[in-house]
Curated annotation (Swiss-Prot):
HAMAP family: SAICAR_synth. One of its GO terms (molecular function) is phosphoribosylaminoimidazolesuccinocarboxamide synthase activity. InterPro entries: SAICAR_synt/ADE2_N (IPR028923), SAICAR_synt_PurC (IPR033934), SAICAR_synth (IPR001636), SAICAR_synthetase (IPR050089), SAICAR_synthetase_CS (IPR018236). One of its GO terms (cellular component) is cytosol. This is Phosphoribosylaminoimidazole-succinocarboxamide synthase. Pathway: Purine metabolism; IMP biosynthesis via de novo pathway; 5-amino-1-(5-phospho-D-ribosyl)imidazole-4-carboxamide from 5-amino-1-(5-phospho-D-ribosyl)imidazole-4-carboxylate: step 1/2. Its EC number is 6.3.2.6. It comes from Edwardsiella ictaluri (strain 93-146). Keywords: ATP-binding, Ligase, Nucleotide-binding, Purine biosynthesis. GO terms for biological process: 'de novo' IMP biosynthetic process; cobalamin biosynthetic process. Belongs to the SAICAR synthetase family. It is an enzyme of class 6 (ligase). It comes from the Bacteria.
């Protein structure tokens, strides 16, 4: 499958059309961003790690009955995926307090959240991805009630699967974001799941093993990503 035209260039991936109108190529770059894209750096191997990590996770979710856009890996940095009509709202599941939740509510980082929280954010970098709710989605027509209910159910199901997967690897799945779209009328998980869009802590030391290492200038970003992949059994080489 060959890349044709560049359809979209995001902060860390480029999307290309193919000769099949129903399929796209996701190309993972070495770019790493923070502050809604205001700070960008490149890290060797990052595109490869995230591409293979994403394929591994999507395969696990598919096996658990969660429909994803993943078709197959094409190369170290490219994957073939279904073309989705993306929903402009992203879902966040929080198992422990971290990030914006800590700032917003003034609670302690790491506080367990039971049951896990489900948040919605409008995908808009210029507006810093404002938090919204189901009422906003209905009023502004971003997504139907039926599809949003499916997105919520699939997010919680993904949390069950992935929390156990990471726990078995000695990691805590603190929180993560998911993006969904429609494929021939069906709600399907799209975009990616990687340490770029999730928080992962070592279960024993609580060391951060995700993009917070870049956001907080902790160093060792790729080493942490590769360690997570190694523990999960993601084939990198």
């Amino acid at each position: 499958m060959q890349k044709l035209a560049e359809l979209y260039r995001g902060k860390a991936k480029t999307v290309y059309t193919t000769e099949d109108p129903d399929l796209l190529i996701l190309s993972f770059r070495n770019d790493t961003s923070a502050l809604d894209g205001q700070r960008i750096e490149q890290f060797d191997r990052k595109g490869m790690v995230n591409n293979k990590f994403n394929h591994f996770i999507m395969s696990k979710l598919e096996a658990a009955g969660i429909p994803t856009q993943m078709e197959r890996l094409l190369s170290d940095t490219d994957a073939l995926v279904k073309k989705l009509e993306m929903v402009p709202v992203e879902c966040v599941i929080r198992n422990r307090a971290a990030g914006s939740l800590v700032k917003r509510l003034g609670i302690e980082e790491g506080m367990p959240l039971n049951p896990p929280l489900f948040d919605l954010f409008l995908k808009n970098d210029a507006m810093h991805d404002p938090m919204v709710n189901e009422s906003y989605c209905r009023t502004f027509g971003w997504v139907s009630d039926e599809h949003l209910a499916q997105m919520k159910a699939l997010s919680y199901r993904a949390n069950e699967v992935l929390s156990q997967l990471f726990d078995d690897a000695g990691l805590i799945l603190v929180d993560f974001k998911l993006e969904f779209g429609l494929y021939k009328g069906q709600v399907v998980l799209g975009d990616e799941f990687s340490p770029d869009g999730s928080r992962l802590w070592d279960k024993t030391t609580l060391a951060k093993m995700d993009k917070d290492r870049f956001r907080q200038n902790l160093g060792g970003l790729i080493e942490a990503y590769e360690e997570v992949a190694l523990r999960l059994g993601v084939p990198l080489d």
